[in-house]
Amino acid sequence: MAIERTLSIIKPDAVAKNVIGQIYSRFENAGLKIVASRMVHLSRADAEKFYAVHAARPFFKDLVDFMISGPVVVQALEGENAILKHRDLMGATDPKKAEKGTIRADFADSIDANAVHGSDAAETAAVEIAFFFPQVNVYSR
């Protein structure tokens, strides 16, 4: 098993519902360590840069508008197979299709307000973690 890091974002809808602690408990109960964390209210420029891969997609403007609608909590998670483990915890993008007991099934309202973001691959995770955390601010433990 490989020790990996992945980026996780608790989105504005979940922050507003005050379920940050419940989501963190799920990470830790699954064996993921939080190795960096911060709350931030993204600027439009930062949200557009972070989601630039989706710039040509029809949902891009709505995604950016949503991500700047309130603060988010960003964390780097570390553990065995962290990327897949985190994606399994999140559940399907559409909370109506997410398995019971996943973060999105339990806390998300819609495909847009779907509570969490997670890296989809090791390469993406490295870029996304670097976007929010200079390497000096990520601490293995």
Curated annotation (Swiss-Prot):
SUPFAM superfamilies: Nucleoside diphosphate kinase, NDK. The active site is at 117 (pros-phosphohistidine intermediate). Its cofactor is Mg(2+). It is an enzyme of class 2 (transferase). GO terms for molecular function: ATP binding; metal ion binding; nucleoside diphosphate kinase activity. Gene3D superfamilies: Nucleoside diphosphate kinase-like domain. One of its GO terms (cellular component) is cytoplasm. It catalyses: a 2'-deoxyribonucleoside 5'-diphosphate + ATP = a 2'-deoxyribonucleoside 5'-triphosphate + ADP; a ribonucleoside 5'-diphosphate + ATP = a ribonucleoside 5'-triphosphate + ADP. ATP binds at residues 11, 59, 87, 93, 104, 114. Belongs to the NDK family. PANTHER family: NUCLEOSIDE DIPHOSPHATE KINASE (PTHR46161), NUCLEOSIDE DIPHOSPHATE KINASE DDB_G0292928-RELATED (PTHR46161:SF3). Major role in the synthesis of nucleoside triphosphates other than ATP. The ATP gamma phosphate is transferred to the NDP beta phosphate via a ping-pong mechanism, using a phosphorylated active-site intermediate. This is Nucleoside diphosphate kinase. The gene is ndk.
